[in-house]
Amino acid sequence: MSSIEEIYHEAKSDKWFQGFALFCRIVLAASFFPTGLVKVMGERFAEGLPSNNPLGHYFDALYLTGYYYTFIGIAQIIIAVLILIPRTSFMGVLMYFPVIVNICVLTYATRFAGTRANTMLLLGCLFLLLWNYDRLKYLLPFKQPKTDPPVIKKPLGIRLRIIFFGGSIAILTFIIIGTFYLWEIGPGNSEAECRNQCFGSKNPVACEEFCDCIYKDGRPLDSCLAAFNKKKNIHIHYKPRY
């Protein structure tokens, strides 16, 4: 058995890691159950998000898809329940993974303010996939050699906890800080939130016009970004003559 497998089996037998895996399962289930219930009840998801917001356009269109919208809600509830049940948690995590990847891509593409939370959910899902590697490996297109019962020769003990949780804190810090500086401008979750960023902007006029483009004109995000960049470049290259 390789050293990586030894570390894996040591983590699986550690109560701290077991508790963290349970915590991740609860969080993932909690992220899907209420959102799925909203769809099943026939209500628009994220009602507080304006229709002219880039992600609001998507939610409006999705809401008008009829029974497909209901189907998504039912699927989310089923996934949440499967994740909570120990015997079916692995199946639930497998179903959760492609959905949360799609959600992450969507939120980053529309510059949604909740990208941090969705990224953390994706990381939690990846942890649970690794946690269930003893099952996952049989689904991979690789020949799996027969292994003897795990015998941990040199346990890391508390060092393993420190390395893992220290690394987790570092990753979360990177995500929080990194996403804060990811975009120069974004639509925010409301018109007021969009305009708040203009106070500290290097190009406040271009920023205000961007917010008008999004929330007053209702134009696509790419079109508004192109207009913002054009206005910004004119401001940069303009040199007044005296």
Task: Name the predicted role of every residue range.
Residues 78-91:
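Juxtamembrane helix-break-helix junctions at the cytosolic face
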Residues 26, 64-65, 84-87:
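Membrane-interface junctions
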Residues 6, 15-16, 57, 73, ...:
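Generic signal for short, ordered secondary-structure residues
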Residues 1-43, 89-242:
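Extended, low-polarity transmembrane helix blocks
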Residues 70-81, 97-98:
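Hydrophobic alpha-helical transmembrane segments
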Residues 31, 35-72:
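Solvent-exposed, well-ordered loop and adjacent helix/strand elements within mature globular domains
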